[in-house]
A protein has these predicted regions:
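ATP-dependent carboxylate activation and anion-phosphoryl transfer catalytic cores
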Residues: 3-157
């Protein structure tokens, strides 16, 4: 079953992607952004199977994930992108060194109680009406296990 990206959880930093997979993501991102002459933000969706990274799609725009990343890393990435798009700065003018003590988890917020007759099953159409962010110190946190066990996620680390 396909689940809409906006209705899913995200964890920063990634907790179950090895260096080889992360390097593929970085390499693909750089190649796509350069090939598209991207100025500003780009949204790229990847799928990973057996340590191979596949590209689903790339869009020259921001996504709902950008505010989450900015808040998690305490960096104004939208401001950086805006200044770059306006020609006031170049990418090299900003330091991109995301550091995080612990982990940040993005969780979708659903308002099904306000819409009792709506189909609650998740699929390709986005159904979340917002997001929340949870900061935890480590992956042994009870909230982390509660969130991911509900979704039957495979926890490798």
């Amino acid at each position: 079953m396909y689940k809409r990206q906006g209705d899913s959880n995200a964890t920063l930093p990634p907790f179950n992607l090895g260096d080889f997979v992360m390097q593929q993501i970085i390499d693909h991102t750089n190649k796509i952004a350069l090939a598209l002459n991207t100025v500003g933000l780009i949204n790229i969706q990847f799928a990973i199977k057996d340590d191979t990274v596949f590209i689903i799609e790339a869009n020259p725009r921001a996504s709902r994930t950008v505010p989450f990343i900015s808040k998690a890393y305490k960096q104004p990435y939208v401001n950086y992108a805006t200044k770059i798009m306006l020609g006031k700065n170049k990418v090299d003018d900003f330091k991109f060194d995301p550091k995080l003590d612990g982990f940040a988890i993005k969780q979708p917020v659903f308002s099904f109680s306000k819409f009792p007759n709506v189909d609650k099953s998740l699929g390709p159409e986005m159904k979340s009406t917002g997001e929340s962010i949870l900061f935890i110190d480590d992956l042994k946190d009870d909230d982390f296990y509660e969130i991911y066990s509900r979704r039957k996620m495979y926890l490798t680390k």
